[in-house]
UniProtKB/Swiss-Prot annotation:
GO (cellular component) term, any one: viral inner capsid
Site residues, Interaction with the intermediate capsid protein VP6: 219, 223, 227, 838, 840
InterPro entries, per database record: Rotavirus_VP2
Region 5-fold hub: start-end pairs: 1-79
Main location: virion
Location in the cell: Virion
GO molecular function, one term: RNA binding
Domain of life of the source: Viruses
UniProt keyword Repeat present: yes
PTM info: Sumoylated with SUMO1 and SUMO2. Sumoylation of viral proteins seems to have a positive role on viral replication.
Function: Inner capsid protein that self-assembles to form an icosahedral capsid with a T=2 symmetry, which consists of 120 copies of VP2, with channels at each of its five-fold vertices. This capsid constitutes the innermost concentric layer of the viral mature particle. It encapsidates the polymerase VP1, the capping enzyme VP3 and the genomic dsRNA, thereby defining the core.
Organism (species): Rotavirus A (strain RVA/Human/Japan/S2/1980/G2P1B[4])
Name of this chain's protein: Inner capsid protein VP2
Length: 879
């Protein structure tokens, strides 16, 4: 049906064209005379190139009507051409993924994370004073110190507690310092005899509180007075006293032992510069030799892409290549000293006016030629190859000059860089417009979906050696993959790098221009020959342009740190063939090469993004592994993956398809956990009980009995229904009970007068009013489980009677022994012991961390005119 409709539309267009033709028959003769007068006129017309556009002078403005008619013809021809191409080639519909402008920023806008420098020690615990109660519930005057959580936010429920530990792990990963300098966080010990220092302000405040506590032993006070730093200047080492919970000490000691900083010297800076830049004779590099012995740096994490984002992650790959493309365009140098557009157009006009009457199609040869388009084309080609962005070609078949320029483009840029449909359309236009008519061959009727391209078909049918040889080169023009300094690079063919392939192209073009075009009118043959002549007149400049393109591409490619994987992108970079014509016709003889500052900037941005990318992968892998080991079966892995992508900054996470998210999750699961992150997780895993028992928010379970149990004395609370151990009780895990929903076992045990312990994280609720407690105690616990069967609403109440309680007089006056059918199981927090909490921490006395290693390198270039390519010959030889 599609073909039938298109055919009908073409017939309608042809009928309209016939009617217009009849109306314009009378005017054609006069138009031809006016056009011939204009072409043969010797009167000079001045063309300027202000604002990068060709402006038309007063002389030309007089014939605006004539030009508008010509423009109508051009537009009509272009429209017919587009319909023809659509008729011959069914356009393949591909999914589009347009990143939002607000999300997609240049990679250079993403600032590298500064080395995380900790200004205080990592702490989970802090010591707190709690009162002591006598056997009768009265409060004593003395206190006791216990380790409690600094930030007590533990939720109730075993699953939620495990999720809390995952969040704690994530927090530790975020805060984990790259290096520690204890000197920067040390503060004065107010109680020191000789103005000594302790490791941080919290240690100092703990020392103050203990020193002022009346119950502190004299020996401890004397020890605090002696607490000070110990410096070993010859070894650049300093020891500071600290007061830390054993778990906090384990964390901080691990951070100190596994710092990421490494000594920095000139060799490291020298090797940090990409080898090809170091060995490039066009760049003169000097290094500052005055590095102090305390200089340090953090080695960037440049592991190659472990996720293979190019494989089945179309949306992600499109975004990352687009970001790379935007960055690459900003570092490609601007072309200088281009041929004056005015002078070049005048020269081209003279070449086109060698014979009497210029035919219609030749008037298009000059359209769109300007220096801005030339510069834009140069940047687009290099940036697309650097970022491996797929390009699509935009052209008009009747503009033979564009097609001839396209032949140069297809010669120097590998086929893979163009989207298949666009490549086929361009090749088909070149074959049917230039190559086949030259040899009198019939038009090629290309079938959509043919595995061979038009050039591959033409190569088998063309007998002329030079043309077939050129077609063979284009058909086999692919990137050569080479691993350089551990990075996969896409390298151009040597014949392109040295420009020799242009001679091959010119031989083919000259052969085509010598052919008779037997099936075409003479004017057609003349137009093609003139177009070829225009390009062949610039043979030397085209060789230089090709060498310049290859040199800039390879020099900038040396600064890329991630593997250059070649995969077709969802969206493409559009390239007008008229801009390729501008580049070919306007390229001058001025060499442009990237400045050293530009190269260093490009290299630093690539290193920063690559290193951040790997660190975020390590974080995501660690969190996923931790979630699995903590048995967080309800955890949404997609949320972890989304968080990972957000931390890379360049992705519009909400628009990434779900299938790619889950594929990313699966690949992250396969990666091993980085050793530092694994050790930190094991530290948390081993000490979960210690952290949990230091919380005042939750209890560890509840004991339920059918008959009342007496309240017992507890040093921390007075008379309470608290159990400190579960010996002698049958235990049932609350989480498993809630998941199974089978309460028969509990009911039977209680009816048989056997107390049962439900073990799990429960809210630790205190209610000091005895009167209110008596009324609701049994209902809140026993009734809910046995009757309502809702364990998730279980909130055991801590029944506490002491001298701080309003109801203490009940016990004192009436000798009443309170009882309860429940007991809250609460583990005892760790008691604070000064001797066990005093630790000496050791670090370097001083060092300086340098983030930008290339700041030590001063660089310059040779005079651009003397710049040489890989073959030790000048990049631009045509002077």
């Amino acid at each position: 049906m599609a073909y039938r409709k298109r055919g009908a539309r073409r017939e309608a267009n042809l009928n309209n064209n016939d009617r217009m033709q009849e109306k314009n028959d009378e005017k054609q003769d006069s138009n031809k005379i006016q056009l011939s007068d204009k072409v043969l006129s010797k009167k000079e017309e001045v063309v300027t190139d202000s604002h990068e556009e060709v402006k038309i002078t007063d002389e030309v403005k007089k014939s605006t009507k004539e030009e508008s008619k010509q423009l109508l013809e051009v537009l009509k021809t272009k429209e017919e051409h587009q319909k023809e191409i659509q008729y011959e080639i069914l356009q393949k519909t591909i999914p589009t993924f347009e990143p939002k402008e607000t999300i997609l920023r240049k990679l250079e806008d993403i600032k590298p994370e500064l080395a995380k420098k900790q200004t205080k020690l990592f702490r989970i615990f802090e010591p707190k004073q709690l009162p002591i109660y006598r056997a009768n519930g009265e409060r004593e005057l003395r206190n006791r110190w216990y380790w409690k959580l600094k930030k007590d936010t533990l939720p109730d429920g075993d699953y939620d507690v495990r999720e809390y530990f995952l969040n704690l792990y994530d927090q530790v990963l975020t805060e984990m310092p790259d290096y520690l300098l204890l000197k920067d966080m040390a503060v004065e010990n107010k109680n020191s005899r000789d103005a000594g220092k302790v490791v941080d302000s919290e240690t100092a405040s703990i020392c103050d509180a203990i020193f002022q506590d009346e119950e502190t032993e004299g020996a401890v006070r004397r020890f605090i007075a002696e607490m000070r730093q110990r410096v070993q200047a010859d070894r650049n080492v300093v020891n500071y006293p600290s007061i830390l919970h054993p778990i906090d000490y384990a964390f901080n000691e691990y951070f100190l032992q596994h710092q990421l900083v490494e000594p920095l010297n000139n060799d490291i800076i020298f090797n940090y510069i990409p080898e090809r830049i170091r060995n490039d004779v066009n760049y003169i590099l000097n290094m500052d030799r005055n590095l102090p012995s305390t200089a340090r740096y953090i080695r960037p994490n440049l592991l190659q892409d472990r996720l293979n984002l190019h494989d089945n992650f179309e949306s992600l790959w499109d975004t990352i290549t687009t970001s790379n493309y935007i960055l690459a365009r900003s570092v490609v140098p601007d072309l200088k000293e281009l041929v004056s557009t005015e002078a070049q157009i005048q020269k081209m006009s003279q070449d086109l006016q060698l014979e009497a009457l210029t035919i219609q199609s030749e008037t298009q040869f000059l359209t769109g030629i300007n220096s801005q388009a030339a510069n834009d084309c140069f940047k687009t080609l290099i940036a697309a190859m650097l970022s491996q962005r797929t390009m699509s070609l935009d052209f008009v078949t009747t503009n033979y000059m564009s097609l001839i320029s396209g032949m140069w483009l297809l010669t120097v840029v590998p086929n893979d860089m163009f989207i298949r449909e666009s490549l086929v359309a361009c090749q088909l236009a070149i074959v049917n417009t230039i190559i086949y008519p030259a040899f009198g061959m019939q038009r090629m009727h290309y079938r959509n979906g043919d595995p061979q391209t038009p050039f591959q078909i033409a190569e088998q049918q063309i007998q002329n050696f030079q043309v077939a040889n050129w077609l063979h080169f284009v058909n086999n023009n692919q990137f050569r993959q080479a691993v350089i300094d551990g990075v996969l690079n896409q390298v151009l063919n040597d014949n392109i790098r040295n420009g020799h392939v242009i001679n091959q192209l010119m031989e083919a073009l000259m052969q085509l221009s010598r052919q008779q075009f037997p099936t075409m009118p003479v004017d057609y043959k003349r137009s093609i020959q003139r177009g070829i002549l225009l390009l062949s007149n610039r043979l030397g400049q085209l060789v230089d342009l090709t060498r310049l393109l290859a040199y800039n591409y390879e020099t900038l490619m040396a600064c890329i740190t991630m593997n250059m994987q070649h995969v077709q992108t969802l969206t493409t970079e559009k390239l007008q063939l008229t801009s390729v014509t501008s580049l070919c016709m306007l390229i001058g003889n001025a060499t442009v090469i990237p400045s050293p500052q530009t190269l260093f900037h490009y290299y630093n941005v690539n290193v920063n993004f690559h290193s951040n990318y790997n660190e975020r992968i390590n974080d995501a892998v660690a969190i996923i592994t931790a979630a699995n080991r903590l048995n967080l079966y309800q955890k949404k892995m997609k949320a972890i993956v989304e968080d990972f992508l957000k931390r890379l900054y360049i992705f519009d996470v909400s628009r990434v398809p779900d299938d790619q998210m889950y594929r990313l999750r699966d690949r992250l699961r396969l990666l091993p956990v980085e050793i530092r992150r694994l050790d930190i997780f094991n530290l948390i895993l081993m000490n979960m009980d210690q952290i949990e028992r230091a919380s005042d928010k939750i209890a560890q379970g509840v004991i339920i009995a059918y008959r009342d149990m007496h309240l017992e004395r507890d040093e921390m609370y007075g008379y309470v229904n608290i159990a400190r151990n579960l010996e002698g009780f049958q235990q049932i895990n609350l989480e498993e009970l809630m998941r199974s929903g089978d309460y028969a076992q509990i009911t039977n045990m209680l009816l048989n007068n056997q107390p049962v312990a439900l073990v799990g994280a429960l809210p630790f609720i205190t209610d000091s009013s005895v009167i209110s407690l008596i009324a609701k105690l049994d209902a809140t616990v026993f009734a809910q489980i046995v009757k309502l069967r809702k364990v998730d609403t279980l909130k055991p109440i801590l029944y506490k009677i002491n001298s701080d309680s309003n109801d203490f007089y009940l016990v004192a006056n009436y000798d009443w022994v309170p009882t309860s059918t429940t007991k809250v199981y609460k583990q005892v927090p760790q008691q604070f012991d000064f001797r066990n909490s005093m630790h000496m921490l050791t670090s370097n006395l001083t060092f300086t961390v340098y983030s930008d290693l290339l700041a030590f390198v001063s660089a310059d270039t040779v005079e651009p005119i003397n710049a040489v390519a890989f073959d030790n010959m000048r990049i631009m030889n045509e002077l």
